[in-house]
Amino acid sequence: MNSYIIMKEEFGWKQYQVYGLNFWFKGYLLGTSLDEVIQQAIDLYQKGTVTMNSVSVWARGLRGHFALVLESENFAIAIVDKDRSIPLFYSTEKTGSLVSSYAPDLLQKLQLDTSSINYQAALEIAMSGYTIGCKSLYEPILQLVAGSFLLYQNDKLKVESYYNYQPWKLRETSEKELKFNLTEITLNMMKDMINSLDGRQAVIPLSAGNDSRLIASALKELNYKNVHCVSYGLKGNFEAETAKLIAE
């Protein structure tokens, strides 16, 4: 298989070698452990046939902020989370496929120069600070977008989304139900955070705004006591004074 995984144990990436697999991971998981996810990767490998659907089902079951790369002698898989909080880059310019967590490594491997610049992407960066879609500043280098994965197998690379954020799809329901759903989602997120804290202190940069107030209120609702709120700025400023009242 002509796949080239250019990964290094740096910037938080860790490599695990099991059952002839190279498994790279960065980030953290919710509701499961890394050992369980590695076992899922082994199970996927031992089934023999890996399909886009089987990878999609696997990816949909993962929660947290993470990215992973899985390589065997027959296939390569790369997955980013629903936010793409940790980037992964790929290219098919040369024979086979290249995957890396660090775009400059692909740039060097492909020996790209200014003739390969994607000027549409450059315009997007100049106007907004980032590119749109899977583009990068160089034409041959692409990136996995939020909620997507790639599968390289039988000398073919396929990219697919396992999750699409579609807020424009409205669902008619009552205001009461919407409030209930929002409360349930918010408290579940906070429960995940409490589990990840594992008893450690939660430090909240508290202001007069609703965002930090929501976090403080939810931790209070869930009876998490190891909380410290901080504010900053000029003495007596409105934000700090209001935050003090909220904290008390």
Stretches with model-predicted labels:
Residues 1-248:
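Cysteine-centered catalytic environments shared across enzyme families
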